[in-house]
Amino acid sequence: TLGYKSMQGYFDCKDWPIEVVKSGDKLNIGKRNIIFQETRMLHWPDSMVSYIPEDKLLISNDAFGQNIATSYRYADEHDQGDFVRAIKEYYYNIVLPYSPQVLKTLPIVESLDIDMIAPDHGLIHRGEKSVKFIVDMYRQMAEQKPQQRAMVIYDTMWHSTEKMAYAVCSGLEEVGVPTRLMSVKSNHHSEIMTELANCGAVIAGSPTHNNTIMPLMASTLTYMKGLRPQNRVGGAFGSFGWSGESAKVLHEMLASMGMDMPADFVKCNWTPRHEA
């Protein structure tokens, strides 16, 4: 029904031969039957998957897909490192806000006799092993259990905040926390979100610029907030010459995402010294 309403918004389709289906409806197309299941907000309001029992095939709409350009058709043919990264990139930049819906949908998927999952875009998952792998991976990503790994994202004007970022990384690694350092100038916000898949902590740094944070950092954190990451720890730091608001702004932005902020923000006037 929602899909039909959307079509009416785009097209003059009242005279088209459209059959509206809902969860549990079955369509016979000769040798095969298509059983429909609504999966609202995964990741569109009108999302629906289709199951063909004769082929043990789930046509999964956007779920289990990837934005990947390849000449291969099946997931098991592709380099697995690149494939797993593509799965994380797609999930953490598109599906992440709908993780509760994912967790509700997975038991429905697991109740079906499936030998192949064909998403709307990306590689096809074939065979029991491949199907189990992607379903388990989706559950892990949707649960967002904290991981003992951190990411430090930063912008810098005259390298003072950059020096602080390197010091934060060194301190974390000295206590055994693997850390990824990412400049928002060098890494697109979608790359930063993909890395967040592996990290339980986000530490953000920016110099003060016009009494607030740098524009690229503001853009990155606004994008991150919209994707609603859960179960993360946050931290903030920054350098300044005069007013020094950036670290406080970062702290408040991370806290507004629901991140646990166990320590106060850290700010440095002018340039950091080793003794600091």
Label each residue range with its predicted role:
Residues 1-3:
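Short internal beta-strands
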Residues 43, 63-96, 140-145:
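Active-site-proximal loop/helix segment associated with metal-binding centers of metalloenzymes
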Residues 153-175:
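Short, charged N-terminal beta->alpha structural module
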Residues 60, 120, 153-155, 182, ...:
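Short hydrophobic segments within beta-strands
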Residues 51, 58, 149-153, 235:
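Conserved beta-strand elements of the Class I
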Residues 70, 80-117, 122-124, 167-180, ...:
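FMN-binding flavodoxin-like domain, especially the glycine-rich phosphate-binding loop
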Residues 122-149:
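Terminal amphipathic helices with adjacent charged low-complexity linkers/tails
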Residues 11-77:
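Catalytic core of the metallo-beta-lactamase
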